[in-house]
Structures are given as C-alpha cells and as structure tokens.
Amino acid sequence: MTTPLYWQTEGEGSDLVLIHGWGMNGAVWQTTSEKLSQHYRVHTVDLSGYGHSAELGCADFDEMVKQVLAQAPKKAAWLGWSLGGLIATKAALTSPERVSQLITVASSPRFSAEKGWRGIKPLVLSQFTEQLKTDFTLTVERFMALQAMGSPNAKQDIKLVKKAVFSRPMPDQQALATGLMILADIDLREAVSQLSMPVCRMYGRLDGLVPIKVAHDMDELMPNSAKIVFEQASHAPFISHNDEFISELRTFLNQHA
C-alpha cells in the first residue's frame, strides 16, 4: 500500500480541492482556505515530495495526479495554482467524473516558451535545475521572488509565501528537479478542448511566469471557459488580492453549482 499524502480538511459544504505549485506546500493556502471553509469543505494537499509529504520523495507527473485522485473526495471542484493547475487539469482529463468544476490560477497547459507561445524561457528553467544541485533552499527563495515580481506589494507577498512554505518541512530535492522537468516538458494544449466541466482560468496581468498573452491564446483553445484577470496581480493573486480572488472564485462556483 502506498503511503498517503498529507491532507488538511476544514469547513462544511460542497468539496473544494486546492493544489499548490512548485517548491511550495499546502500552507500557502492558509488564509484562503480559512475564508473558503466558511462556505465549502476545503481540502488542501501537500504533493509528494513537498511539505509534510516530503518524505514520500519524488513522483513523476502521472503518478502525482494518481496520488491526489486516490485521496481526493469522490467529486469536488478542483483548483490548482501554477504547477498545481497542470495536475488539476490532468485529473479533470483522466477522471472527469471526479471533477465538477476546474479552476486554474496563474497556470498554463504549456509553461515552457517556444516559437509562437509565451512562457518561461527554457534557459531559465535549466538554470533553476542547475542551481538546485548546489543550493536548493536559495533556488526556492529565488523562485518565490520571481513569482512576486511585478506585484505592487512584492515584498509583502514574498514574506507571506516564505512564512507559509518554511512552516513545513523543506521539499525533497529530487521532487523539485522533477517539478522543473514537468514545467519544461508537459504540454496539454491539444487536450484541454476535451474538458467537459465548467472551467475558470485566473491570471495576474503582471505575471512574469505565465504572461498575460497566454490568457488570450487560451481564449482560442478553450472558448467556453471563463477568464478572470487580476489587473494588479502577479503570479499569486490569491495572496496579493485575497478578498477579490475569493469573491471571483465564489461567484464562479455558485454560477456552476
């Protein structure tokens, strides 16, 4: 039997799963889940190799998706931030009967930039991979700074993310390396048109990792999905614009309940 992932569940109501991004853990949702738990039964997970699931070590992309599905509620709305958006999207594609609504935050079906598609330059991803080998704590901190870049409250945002992440065990080094490979290699662009449940895509207009051009390109790939852009936010709108984020999320979930 596989060792279970670490989950936190709070609140009552319809089920909502929250999935963190690369280098992070479920504590990053603390303020968000406290507020959402007044309306929903909120489930936050530490992915394999992260936070309280760090000792489980590394898992590849498909295995990560299976691990979350194995312990998630039978049917729930799934919300994934950044790398977590890829995992939530893949879960919705492989097990659509389990995902009632899909929400992606500062995410993309293809994170790596290529001709005709905006994203993270492959060189940046390979530099992070190299830095991991020498100082993975510093690498995670640099990624946090990159996430907040552009936000008017960048310093405060980084402080909040750091506090959350460092409140739990540091991620497994190999899990971090595998996560960067996922960001570099996974491409779900052709698959997303198959999604049948209501989908909401949330973006920060100032995001340096998922450029706003991606939001417009996704309008063509997913014409039936909802799109929300937080004008003054960067890569973590649920941290920099928490009340606005929760209001938009609740509106979408209520419309598609």
Swiss-Prot record:
Pathway: Cofactor biosynthesis; biotin biosynthesis. Residues 16-240 form the AB hydrolase-1 domain. One of its GO terms (cellular component) is cytoplasm. GO terms for biological process: biotin biosynthetic process. Its EC number is 3.1.1.85. InterPro entries: AB_hydrolase_1 (IPR000073), AB_hydrolase_fold (IPR029058), BioH (IPR010076), Carboxylesterase_BioH (IPR050228). Monomer. This is Pimeloyl-[acyl-carrier protein] methyl ester esterase.
